Amino acid sequence: MKKRISLYVRSVLTFLRIVITKIFNIKGFHSAFIQDFSITTKISVNERGKILLKKHIHTKRNVILCAEGGTLEIGEGCFFNNGCMAVAKERITIGNRAAFGPNVLIYDHDHDISSAESIHDSGYKTSPVVIGDDVWIGCKYRYTSRNGNRA
């Protein structure tokens, strides 16, 4: 009975969080209302970023989903374990039913260290990341990567 009550409370809080996030990010945030987010999940849309979430996405504690000028698209039925982070400056596309182990970091960018400037002024190199359907990733995911279906 306690689990059922906890699930209902979490569902209501997730729904409210999605509504509030949508209000403050009208153009940059699109989500199905059927999600299961931990109370500590952070969603951030900066600059011209966009986050597109399909339904039935489940997150554990301390997950961060961030679009910093890029597009973060997450397919149906995805699972993010504790401490996962996805940050898009260009584009990250995650297929349906993808699962991520604890502390997986997904970035589509890296510091541009080829520049003669200091690391703080050098900017970023970006490349799209595509993760297919039915994929399980258990550790850090490097930018410029492409992972096909059922990997």
Go through each PLM region and give its residues.
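Domain-scale signature associated with acetyltransferase and cell-envelope carbohydrate enzymes
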Residues: 1-107, 128-134, 140-143, 151
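Extracellular/periplasm-exposed beta-strand and loop segments of Gram-negative cell-envelope proteins
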Residues: 110-111
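A short acidic, helix-capping loop that chelates divalent metal ions and anchors anionic groups
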Residues: 115-117
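A short acidic, glycine-rich active-site loop
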Residues: 119-129
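Extracellular carbohydrate recognition
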Residues: 147
